[in-house]
Amino acid sequence: MIKAHIFIDAGHLHYHLFKEQWRIDYAKLIEYFSQKDYFPLMVFYYEGMITEQSYFSKHPNATPKEFNQAKKNKKAYFGKLRSLNFTVRWKPVHRIFDLESKEYRFKCNFDVELTMDVMETVLTRETDTFIICSGDGDFTRLIKFLKGKAKNIIVAGFKNSINKGLLDVAHQIVFLEAIKHKIEWK
């Protein structure tokens, strides 16, 4: 088995999943890589936690009770991932003003956290393969660095949302829609 660390940029993946109206069962995703002869030493999962501002902007007719339940559900979901030995990184979703569109939007970016976890892994753990589940082009430089350290890089994401830079630098690409039947939450 090939030792691997897996990094899941859930915020990036969820945007596409929301449009396509399906969900990933992350335990099945890890199982998929295990069946491909990768032994996941650690799995890191990054996702934003809803805030009142973000929740009520998307659900203006919701009640405080519904918000509290949604937040409780998200915390329970993170707990389930932890029970599967995932390292869960979360922070609040923030509202930012987009100068281009002149509208507010919600953002929770984990580029720095994911990069720091990768760097710490390179420095402190013996691993052969890094599996980055994201299509975010901001990780192109990170992947080039890992390749320079003779690491195998797999990028898993959606065909129409993986940045071209990632396609050019990764050793292998896994299109999640191609394995939907194996990883979909049912």
Predicted regions, residues:
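Domain-level signal for Mg2+-assisted phosphodiester chemistry and nucleotide/NA-binding surfaces
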Residues: 1-106, 152-157, 161
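Nuclease catalytic cores that cleave nucleic-acid phosphodiester bonds
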Residues: 79-186
